Amino acid sequence: PPYMLSPLPLSLGFSSQCESMDIRIEGEMTDADIAGRMRDVMPEGLRLLSVREPVMQPSEIAFADYRAQLCFDAPELAAGFLPGAGAALAGESLIVQKPGKSGRKKVMKEIDLLPLIASCSMEQKERAVLLKLILPAGNQTNISPALLLDALEEKAGVQDVGREITRLELLTKDLQMFE
């Protein structure tokens, strides 16, 4: 039977430039036919970029590349975020509570984010701080950028910060683009 599966659904409130979808259809159709039919029924704001045979298995997704923007009320507040967040990233550990499962029960698990972060850089742009993040994303380990941002904001002593988070790419364990 036909199906549609998103191997790594996007969190609510995030935007993306790279969602991947696995579909199965009945009958013979070309990639162009599939693309045309899907474009006709795509929700507003979603754009189909391409349809092609998969090169990799969804299980090969290991990381995601994100850009996050934290929006402050004043440049001084943005500048004040950097030392605390930088110290947290340079520390020995960054322990957070992450929702998880134990069997069928939902539990809170304590994890150290620092060894899981593949890449993190920060830069101030006037009233904003731009972060470039590569975080685990996949079947084995999945770290939401919101979880990391929550921890950095707490360590920097800021709250009620506006956020924009965009997923740019899904990546393999070798940090190659998932295809």
Stretches with model-predicted labels:
Residues R47-P54:
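Acidic, low-complexity central loop/insert segments
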Residues G91-E179:
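Core RNA-modification/binding signature centered on pseudouridine synthases
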Residues E26-D31, D73-E76, G138:
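Helix N-cap motif at beta-to-alpha junctions
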Residues E60-F63, A128:
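Short gly/pro-enriched beta-turn/loop segments at secondary-structure junctions
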Residues P1-E26, P54-P58:
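Short, charge-patterned binding micro-sites
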Residues D31-M42, L77-A90, L147-L149:
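Short amphipathic alpha-helices in soluble, non-transmembrane regions
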Residues E19-I23, A62-F72:
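Short glycine-/aliphatic-rich beta-strand segments at the starts of folded cytosolic domains
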Residues M56-E60, S121-Q124:
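Short, conserved, surface-exposed binding loops centered on an aromatic residue
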